[in-house]
Amino acid sequence: MAARKGFAAPLLVKDYILTSILYLIKNIDGIYFKGGTAINKIFLDHPRLSEDIDFTITKSEKEVQKEIQSVLEKNEFVESITEGKNVGGFLRMIVYYNLDSRKGEIFIDLNKRGKLVTPPENHAINHFYRNYIPEFSMKTVGKEEMVAEKVAATMGRNKPRDHYDTYNIIRAGACINLELVKKKCKSSGNEFSVMRMFKKAQTLKNRWDEDMAPLLAEPISFQEVIQTLAKHFKLKEAKEHAKSKKAVKQ
């Protein structure tokens, strides 16, 4: 399968476990799948694989943690489940797995801080494992909101995968609601600024191959991604606008 899909075998094992986890917890109430893993598994046809799972939750973190743990502990591939970061409405579960002597860990991030802004949706989860995992769907954050969170992430943190996912969102022709992006920036305490998306470009470039190569079936250059984002979000115009505002103040 690894050769057929173009991904490294260890990452496909991890993706299989990750997909199995989604299948097992799909009926738990009050959890809404989101983030880069959701975007790639639902809307983008797997240009990259993932290593973690993100949810917005509408119940207490401890309640959801208990329900997920109860379901997963019964599965033979799960060796143990521990609690990672637990800070003010955010809780990380760490699932340690062992499948045919291939061991690893998957993060399940539960976030109650980020409130649902648009109505939740239900989407089919695309995957490569039809012979082992049935077709299934699960509750998700709305597509438009999910996309807005991803774009906001390019302005609020410094992870190459955020820029890569946004690049693929643009190529897929998905709607990017900038007003919703502004709301997501505000709710996470970050400034909405197109220029912030490119502020640490050199750091992103330095991390690009190390961070992205293991996740991709087909390599893509940092330059291609950053140029596409600069054109779509009109970086040149944003710089000129900032320059003119500065001149007026002086």
Specify the residue positions occupied by each region the protein language model found:
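Active-site glycine-centered loops adjacent to acidic/histidine catalytic or metal-binding residues
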Residues: G36
